[in-house]
């Protein structure tokens, strides 16, 4: 049977025996772009369990919009927000992104809105907000802490550190100074994906009641959910699972996993997430082929950086052999303990000799759950 694995920069197409294929995951459907602008405006005008966006603010409010630039249709969403706020009479609109976010290069800021980049290392930009129930003092960017209204906009996705990313995580840890503990590649699957209690608590302490979350499709924006914060979390968790939860009957001897997608650049964090997804689908002693377009700097940041505990890569490589397609030289890849492949077709050759096979497109956005 014919199979395809999508990743940033390309796709692998090959033929495999159907009796050896356990599952092939392609992700959700492509989003329909024809009515995208109307769907975005509808979400803002008829939100969940909350008045429309235009009734959330009053003229003269200082509005800050913590924003996740990795959200599909990011510039269109910002434009619709700016239009609605401008119609109400809001003149101070600031879009703020985390300076550590690498997906901001194509973000277009609408007229009437300014862009601020948050630098968590600059203590002069931070202000004390409150102390959490666990006793942690919360510091956020001063513009956020002092705003009259904070409307966070985030991409929904799985995040092993906090359960799920979304508008709540754009605020905390996105615009604060906190760092969360590194999570092992081999960590058990988190049972809860609605969002971490602490980022949710910080949103509440800040008074951010109206939040906006986007569900990405295989390409484009699949759904925009706006409204009362807890309602957005609940609806968002269900929508995320409906789009990106991959229920797998059994592990395979070979997993071929694509990192990134045809319309987006992959990041070091995406490599970690996709690697983790593939590990959950492969048998001990099996093989993983990761298809990427990343360079050596990004690969080293992902596998030797602070996002993984010390020695974690070695533990993962003891579970399965890992082949990597990338822009890095073969010697540099192999210095990390991985096996380099320089063409996607080499992953197909691995499939020809595997006893069982799973393929996962855009593995970095996928949550793999074993049913057995």
Regions from the language model: what does each represent?
Residues 1-43:
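N-terminal amphipathic/basic leader segments beginning at the initiator methionine
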Residues 48-66, 85-90, 246-254, 281-283, ...:
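Glycine-rich phosphate/diphosphate-binding loops that line cofactor/substrate pockets in enzymes
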Residues 233-301:
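Long, well-ordered mid-to-C-terminal structural blocks that present hydrophobic/aromatic surfaces
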Residues 188-263:
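Membrane-embedded hairpin module used as a gating/binding unit in multi-pass transport
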Residues 3, 271-372:
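C-terminal non-catalytic interaction/assembly regions of soluble proteins
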Residues 71-92, 274-282, 288:
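Histidine-anchored nucleotide/phosphate-binding helix
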């Amino acid at each position: 049977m014919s199979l395809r694995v999508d990743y940033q920069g390309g796709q692998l197409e090959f033929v495999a025996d159907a009796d050896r294929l356990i599952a092939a995951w392609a992700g959700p459907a492509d989003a329909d772009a024809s009515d995208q602008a109307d769907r975005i405006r509808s979400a803002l005008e008829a939100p969940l369990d909350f008045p429309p966006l235009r009734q959330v603010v009053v003229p003269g409010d200082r509005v800050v919009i913590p924003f996740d630039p990795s959200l599909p249709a990011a510039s269109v969403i910002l434009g619709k927000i700016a239009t609605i706020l401008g119609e109400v009479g809001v003149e101070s609109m600031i879009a703020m992104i985390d300076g550590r976010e690498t997906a901001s290069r194509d973000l277009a800021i609408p007229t009437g809105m300014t862009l601020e980049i948050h630098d968590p290392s600059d203590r002069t930009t931070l202000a004390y907000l409150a102390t959490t129930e666990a006793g942690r003092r919360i510091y956020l960017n001063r513009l956020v802490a002092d705003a009259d209204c904070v409307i966070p906009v985030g991409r929904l996705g799985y995040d092993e550190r906090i359960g799920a990313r979304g508008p709540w995580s754009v605020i905390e840890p996105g615009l604060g100074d906190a760092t969360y503990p590194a999570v092992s590649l081999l960590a058990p699957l988190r049972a809860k994906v609605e969002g971490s209690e602490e980022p949710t608590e910080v949103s509440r302490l800040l008074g951010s009641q109206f939040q906006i979350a986007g569900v990405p499709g295989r390409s484009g924006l699949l759904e925009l959910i706006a409204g009362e914060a807890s309602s957005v979390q609940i609806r968002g968790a269900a929508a995320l699972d409906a789009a990106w939860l991959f229920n797998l009957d059994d592990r395979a001897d070979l997993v071929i996993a694509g990192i990134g997608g045809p319309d987006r650049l992959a990041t070091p964090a995406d490599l970690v997430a996709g690697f983790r997804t593939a590990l959950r689908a492969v048998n001990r002693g099996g093989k993983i082929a990761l298809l990427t377009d990343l360079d050596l700097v990004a690969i080293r940041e992902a596998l030797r950086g602070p996002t993984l505990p010390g020695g974690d890569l070695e533990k993962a490589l003891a579970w399965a052999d890992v082949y990597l397609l990338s822009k890095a030289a073969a010697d540099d890849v192999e210095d990390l303990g991985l096996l380099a492949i320089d063409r996607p077709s080499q992953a197909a050759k691995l499939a020809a000799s595997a006893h069982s096979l799973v393929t996962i497109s855009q593995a970095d956005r996928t949550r793999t759950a074993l049913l057995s």
